[in-house]
Structure formats: C-alpha cells, structure tokens
Swiss-Prot record:
Species this protein is from: Human adenovirus C serotype 2 (HAdV-2)
Residues of the site described as Cleavage: G32, M33, G51, I52
Keyword Signal: no
UniProt modification remark: Cleaved by the viral protease during virion maturation to form the mature protein.
Transmembrane segments: none
Propeptide residues per the UniProt entry: 2-32, 52-80
Name of protein: Pre-core protein X
Pfam families, A to Z: Adeno_PX
Amino acid sequence: MALTCRLRFPVPGFRGRMHRRRGMAGHGLTGGMRRAHHRRRRASHRRMRGGILPLLIPLIAAAIGAVPGIASVALQAQRH
C-alpha cells in the first residue's frame, strides 16, 4: 500500500504560478505574440533568482516518494 505525503515549504523569491492572460484587446496578433514571448523570457529569468533550491525541491520530493517502493522491493528480495 502506498502512502503519499505532501509538504509545503516557503521558498523566498517564488511567487507561485503565473496566470496567462488571454486576448490582447486593441492589439494585432503579431503584437500580442511578441509581448507574450517577451514576458516568458522575463519569467524564466525571475525564477532563477530563487537560486538552486526551487530546482532541488521536486527532486527531493521524488526521492522521498520513492523510498517506500525501494524498501518493499528490498524486503521482497530478502524473503526470496
């Protein structure tokens, strides 16, 4: 039986998910696309300010989640 546990950690500099606005009123299609591309570039730069910790959190969570599975396989191998 698998048990999943979710933990929340405050990460300085991380503001959550960015919501994309649909429809640029008063702008042409190409103008809206240029602005959206420019915003994405800024958002990726903003994410890097938090350092390497936001990149490590999903890896640590995956490793913690894999521990029960690894332990059960080890126990089964030990029994056989």
